[in-house]
Amino acid sequence: MLLSIGMLMLSATQVYTILTVQLFAFLNLLPVEADILAYNFENASQTFDDLPARFGYRLPAEGLKGFLINSKPENACEPIVPPPVRDNSSGTFIVLIRRLDCNFDEKVLNAQRAGYKAAIVHNVDSDDLISMGSNDIEVLKKIDIPSVFIGESSANSLKDEFTYEKGGHIILVPEFSLPLEYYLIPFLIIVGICLILIVIFMITKFVQDRHRARRNRLRKDQLKKLPVHKFKKGDEYDVCAICLDEYEDGDKLRILPCSHAYHCKCVDPWLTKTKKTCPVCKQKVVPSQGDSDSDTDSSQEENEVSEHTPLLRPLASASTQSFGALSESRSHQNMTESSDYEEDDNDTDSSDAENEINEHSVVVQLQPNGERDYNIANTV
């Protein structure tokens, strides 16, 4: 699951980077505004800036080539004179219209009805370019030709050198720059998808890390099952391997299954917040099969009694095996020393064999509460 999300994240990032680079390179190479390429009878060219209208058809990708005709009347607020008829070919004619006196859509519609393939509206007493629009939906539905807007200086130059009567022709170059919504919306969609994938990836990784950390730590109920021993002088352990302080009487020690003991205040945070292993030998504190299985097995072993069961059997809890083994070894040592003493007594003083001899054998066994219980058995 994590691998598939990572691969998906990588592919989405690569696609996002490629599209971003190509998009910005494409936008930097394309012009911001459309142009009018004008050619006179000597084939000398000149370029004029224009601004396409917000209604009507767009210019074809290859541009629109035609002959420029002055509108009659110039404002085109009423039906205008149609273009001349050419004998050799139909030709394409573009009309030049003066601004003011009526709406832009009305001017362009009159040019369309007269038979022109495009309309150029020029400003009056200004070279500012205006974006032509319309509020009449009925008129907009009827307009099928493209139209552009130019400044007054450009219009005067076109009239002087590049009209049909002067032997010139023009080419309306389309606007190649994409509108903002054309590239901004896909860009935002790609960015949004990448952000969503990043959030999903981070959430998945966070959940997996939390689950892994929780699995490697010891729960509070598991910690309570580990035995606690109150230290006394003479015990086997003397120094805490975590804080390096010597044990003192009354210190509470946490005994791990590996027979290592630590201060409760030192080892408990390690087990519950870091790892459920011994800080020294790295042995697991809790078996991987689960506490329930270990508890069941220990209870079954405790209930099973046979002829091979030792008289001083260790406690069933695996966590107290270390102290149980220690107590059993000390008990065996005391019994051996007692028997040796009896043999020497019998060899040196045989006359006292008939007297009663109290033989004391001390059996030391560690009780579940962690304290030694001394039982004295009197044999006669």
From Swiss-Prot:
Annotated compartments: Endoplasmic reticulum membrane; Late endosome membrane; Lysosome membrane; Nucleus inner membrane
Zn-finger region bounds: RING-type: 240-282
GO MF term (any one): ubiquitin-protein transferase activity
Extent of Acidic residues compositional bias: 292-304, 339-356
Catalytic activity field: S-ubiquitinyl-[E2 ubiquitin-conjugating enzyme]-L-cysteine + [acceptor protein]-L-lysine = [E2 ubiquitin-conjugating enzyme]-L-cysteine + N(6)-ubiquitinyl-[acceptor protein]-L-lysine
Pathway per the UniProt entry: Protein modification; protein ubiquitination
Cytoplasmic side: 204-380
Description of its domains: The RING-type zinc finger domain is required for E3 ligase activity and for promoting ER stress-induced JNK activation and apoptosis.
Name of the molecule in the record: E3 ubiquitin-protein ligase RNF13
Region Disordered: start-end pairs: 285-380
CDD domains, per database record: PA_C_RZF_like, RING-H2_RNF13
Functional description taken from the UniProt entry: E3 ubiquitin-protein ligase that regulates cell proliferation. Involved in apoptosis regulation. Mediates ER stress-induced activation of JNK signaling pathway and apoptosis by promoting ERN1 activation and splicing of XBP1 mRNA. Also involved in protein trafficking and localization.
GO CC annotations, alphabetized: cytoplasm; cytosol; endoplasmic reticulum; endoplasmic reticulum membrane; late endosome membrane; lysosomal membrane; nuclear inner membrane; nucleoplasm
Keyword check for Transferase: yes
Organism from which the protein derives: Bos taurus (Bovine)
Membrane topology: Single-pass type I membrane protein
Record text on subunit structure and interactions: Interacts with ERN1.
Glycosylated position list: 88
Entry's transmembrane regions: 183-203
